Amino acid sequence: RFLRGNQLDSVMNYPFANAIIDFVRTGNSDALKETVFEILENYPEKSIHLMMNHIGTHDTARILTRLSKNNDNFGDRAKQSQMKLSEEEYNFAKKRLFEAVLLQFTLPGVPSVYYGDEAGMTGGFDPFCRGYFPWGKEDKEITEFYKKLGKLRIHCKAFCGGEYVPWQLPQGVFGFERKCKSAKALTVINCSESEMSVDVPEEYKKSKSHLGKSLIGKTLTLKPHEFTLIIL
């Protein structure tokens, strides 16, 4: 009732956030597809493209910390105050983060970034998700990934109101196109534990990936937790 034109322009898209996190954790692409479908079917069309797509806020644990594990059981406050990711846990979470951010920036809606997520901040639930910004100690690889996706969103008009076209792919693989009159974009992510090959339309054959794995002919082969973003 809040999105009928006389109350709010947008709301925070927690259903997307939860489904994205579940997908990159478990590979449950069917659940993500169903969540996207429910939002597109039940929300006012004009509001869909204004939804605040986030993967972390001041009300949640930091996204890198969440993605370092398969659940949000971080213990009590005393335990969270001492919690620090090992290098192995951080790198594991970082790989998942790139997948989650790619979905955040390419699904219908507007990406809403919680300060510090683009710099690699970690932490448990409030107040441990509200630390100081790590000036001079940012994870530059993560920052550059966010910056590149931001530039691609500006460049590709299909992300700003374009049609969402889901693909039928094996469980664990999530793919879709965004289309408008002047542009098209293809996003495919493999969160399964097996290598997957996907045939793509002829129009993408000569295109290079703007982010992630490139095509070989008409075939896109993705190892576990690889992805691609192709823009026409």
Model-derived features: where do they sit?
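Solvent-exposed beta-hairpin/edge-strand motifs
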Residues: 202-212
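Amphipathic alpha-helical
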Residues: 146-156
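C-terminal beta-strand-rich structural cap/linker in extracellular carbohydrate-active enzymes
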Residues: 218-232
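Aromatic/acidic polysaccharide-binding cleft in carbohydrate-active enzymes
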Residues: 5, 53-85, 101-139
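Acidic/polar loop patches that form or flank catalytic/metal-binding clefts of enzymes
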Residues: 111-115, 157-163
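Active-site-proximal helices and loops of the catalytic beta/alpha 8
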Residues: 1-54, 122-148, 201
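Carbohydrate-binding surface patches
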Residues: 167-201
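Aromatic-anchored helix/helix-loop segment that forms the rim or "lid"
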Residues: 30-33, 37, 71-98, 155
